[in-house]
Amino acid sequence: MLRELVKNKKLRARVLERAEEFKLNNRAEENVWFRELILCILTSNSSFISAYKALNYIMDEIFSLSEDQMSKRLRLAGYRFYNLKAKYIANARKLYGNLKTKIKPIADYSQEEARQYIINNIDGLGLKESSHFLRNVGYFDLAIIDRHVLHFLNEIGTSNLKIKNKKDYYLAESILKSISINLGIQVGLLDLYIFFKQTNTIVK
């Protein structure tokens, strides 16, 4: 089922085009890395569409808005967790100027270590969100396990797998890495195929 999508030349070209955009982000300036970080904070426990809409409500004034003003903007955008995410974003602003210089050298050496560094140092990002951020700035060795990917794993018979802790995430990631190797694609891009399979679109 997924193999047919991977073999689809038109879809594969779209995924590879998206991958090139992520690689460009890797070479981009701090503002691009920061924007991707904020998007991933907003995507946590929310849909990409909702997160992207919320991002556009705050990004132009993200450094001038108070936490309370940011919360109100997010609420106006129809975003659910406006108070909590405003707090996370306000804290993330303190990283601006050092985000890329801190994370890139670690990720260039070990993407797993970079993911753990992000989890330890940036509020609001867990395994999924940290993997998502790293993928969006050009690192493709980590799995992004959202509800679409979980649904896919359960579809192919992985015993109703649920992500309740790190152990569950790492187990699911190991399964996805095996699938990716078998399909000849990088695991950080696998979710794009799965997302397309379930929604008929590529965003993220």
Curated annotation (Swiss-Prot):
InterPro entries: DNA_glyclase/AP_lyase_Ogg, DNA_glycosylase, HhH-GPD_domain, HhH_base_excis_C. The record marks 204 as: Important for guanine/8-oxoguanine distinction. One of its GO terms (molecular function) is class I DNA-(apurinic or apyrimidinic site) endonuclease activity. Its EC number is 3.2.2.-, 4.2.99.18. The active site is at 128, 146. SUPFAM superfamilies: DNA-glycosylase. Catalyzes the excision of an oxidatively damaged form of guanine (7,8-dihydro-8-oxoguanine = 8-oxoG) from DNA. Also cleaves the DNA backbone at apurinic/apyrimidinic sites (AP sites). Belongs to the type-2 OGG1 family. This is 8-oxoguanine DNA glycosylase/AP lyase. The gene is ogg.
